[in-house]
């Protein structure tokens, strides 16, 4: 085997590979001889079919299999020989081949992994959110828990913030229907952010049985992307309007939250402890977002098109799945790949940066860190020990906690390198309630 590599651009390579024919012909003959021992054909006993008939019947198929395997092996060998890291799949083009040629040749065009040069992070500013959980924050959380367990009763007045409504909805873009609720309608609590804010503002002031038609102009950066920059006309019928009736903060409420003896003070302590854990979790999320952005902002990187295209496909599939769950007819939705390229490029860039950094700085999560992450997952379930057992019953299930634990190591590495400053934040801002 011989291979020559041509550099087309920073990442694109063209490799011409020559493979001797004689070993391939020998392999073809060997396979046909083996096949002749077992092949069955009408008019012949098994294994007694003449070799020339077997060759005539199966020769082309066997030759194609041998050639395909030869290309795969030789490409892999040539890549290793030339110390190339292939990104994505190669495009293979076979050169013309005459019967007596001593070699077959093909041209493989592909991209290689880029160099990842992570810059100086010492000037990258990262703000560490600071929030102390006090009585006011606990009270807000208790109010949320009470609202979550509210019962609702019909009212004849117009709808307002906090009411539960059921609506039937049809949405149009340029007079083409893009969304329609089913016969059960759509349940919403006004003001809880279930839809775009401008949409929710139209839901107040309407009585059960009324109808309202209005338009919403979505911004260019709206998610999901198919509504970005579009004006949507909504035809909404208000089926029901119900007001909330909150439960009392008492022993019965405590028991509903799992405090078996109904001790209200114990319930308050558990809520406080849980809230502190959630605040710590939100702070870690904010730090991770900033750490990853610092890496993106300080890394020179050209991303292979193959990686971007693969990520675009994944994002489109994810968006389609999300729309299906919402009852949107995908036949009326055109998800242009260009809508996803910016996010796909960011995702692919970050993946390359993290891979380089983890390998360079040896940041892979160890067994103890993975175990700690599994324990964190398990605490969300009623029987955490069973969840831990489930994860360790199949090592593939540990991939997700291992990846998240490794990301935590990356964040810690960035925080040690960057300029980190503490910043006091409001409870509602941190919890996403504002």
Swiss-Prot record:
Key words, A-Z: Cell cycle, Cell division, Chaperone, Cytoplasm, Isomerase, Rotamase
Single GO term (MF): peptidyl-prolyl cis-trans isomerase activity
Keyword Cell cycle set for record: yes
Span of domain PPIase FKBP-type: 162-247
Subcellular location: Cytoplasm
Record-level GO cellular component terms: cytoplasm
Keyword Methyltransferase included in the entry's annotation: no
Documented EC number(s): 5.2.1.8
InterPro entries the record matches: PPIase_dom_sf, PPIase_FKBP_dom, Trig_fac, Trigger_fac_C, Trigger_fac_C_sf, Trigger_fac_ribosome-bd_bac, Trigger_fac_ribosome-bd_sf, Trigger_fact/SurA_dom_sf
EC supergroup of this enzyme: isomerase
Record's catalysed reaction(s): [protein]-peptidylproline (omega=180) = [protein]-peptidylproline (omega=0)
Coiled coil, from the record: none
Domain of life per record: Bacteria
GO BP terms: 'de novo' cotranslational protein folding; cell division; chaperone-mediated protein folding; protein transport; protein unfolding
Any Pfam family matching the protein: Trigger_N
Role noted for this protein: Involved in protein export. Acts as a chaperone by maintaining the newly synthesized protein in an open conformation. Functions as a peptidyl-prolyl cis-trans isomerase.
Domain commentary: Consists of 3 domains; the N-terminus binds the ribosome, the middle domain has PPIase activity, while the C-terminus has intrinsic chaperone activity on its own.
Family recorded in the similarity comment: Belongs to the FKBP-type PPIase family. Tig subfamily.
Protein's name according to its UniProt entry: Trigger factor
């Amino acid at each position: 085997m011989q291979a020559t590599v041509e550099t087309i651009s920073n990442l694109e390579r063209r490799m011409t590979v020559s493979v001797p024919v004689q070993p391939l012909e020998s392999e073809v003959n060997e396979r046909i001889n083996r096949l002749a021992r077992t092949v069955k054909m009408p008019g012949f006993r098994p294994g007694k079919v003449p070799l020339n008939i077997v060759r005539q019947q199966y020769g082309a198929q066997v030759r194609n299999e041998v050639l395909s395997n030869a290309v795969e092996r030789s490409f892999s060998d040539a890549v290793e020989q030339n110390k190339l890291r292939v990104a994505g799949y190669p495009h293979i083009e076979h050169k013309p081949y005459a019967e007596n040629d001593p070699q077959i040749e093909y041209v493989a065009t592909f991209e290689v992994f880029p160099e990842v040069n992570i810059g100086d992070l010492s000037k990258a500013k990262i703000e560490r959110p600071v929030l102390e959980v006090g009585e006011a924050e606990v009270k807000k959380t208790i109010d949320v828990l009470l609202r979550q367990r509210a019962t609702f009763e019909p009212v004849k007045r117009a709808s307002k913030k906090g009411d539960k409504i059921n609506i039937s909805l049809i949405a149009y873009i340029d007079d083409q229907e893009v969304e329609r609720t089913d016969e059960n309608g759509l349940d919403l609590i006004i003001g809880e952010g279930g839809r775009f804010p401008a949409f929710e503002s139209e839901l107040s002031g309407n009585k059960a049985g009324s109808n309202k038609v209005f338009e919403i102009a979505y911004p260019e950066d709206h998610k999901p992307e198919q509504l970005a920059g579009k004006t949507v006309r909504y035809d909404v019928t208000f089926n029901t309007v119900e007001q909330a009736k909150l439960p009392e903060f008492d022993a019965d409420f405590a028991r509903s939250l799992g405090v078996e003896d109904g001790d209200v003070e114990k319930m308050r302590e558990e809520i406080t402890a849980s809230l502190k854990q959630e605040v710590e979790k939100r702070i870690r999320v904010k730090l991770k977002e900033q750490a990853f952005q610092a890496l993106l902002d300080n890394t020179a990187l050209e991303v292979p098109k193959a990686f971007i295209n693969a990520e675009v496909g994944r994002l489109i599939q994810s968006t389609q799945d999300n729309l299906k769950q919402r009852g949107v007819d995908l036949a009326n939705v055109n998800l242009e790949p260009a809508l996803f390229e910016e996010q796909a490029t960011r995702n692919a860039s970050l993946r390359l940066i993290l891979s380089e950094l983890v390998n360079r700085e040896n940041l892979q999560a160890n067994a103890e860190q993975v175990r700690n992450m599994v324990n964190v997952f398990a605490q969300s379930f009623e029987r955490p020990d069973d969840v831990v057992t489930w994860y360790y019953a199949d090592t593939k299930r540990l991939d997700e906690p291992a990846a998240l634990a490794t990301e935590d190591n990356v964040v810690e590495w960035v925080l040690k390198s960057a300029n980190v400053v503490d910043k006091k934040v409001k409870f509602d801002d941190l919890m996403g309630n504002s």
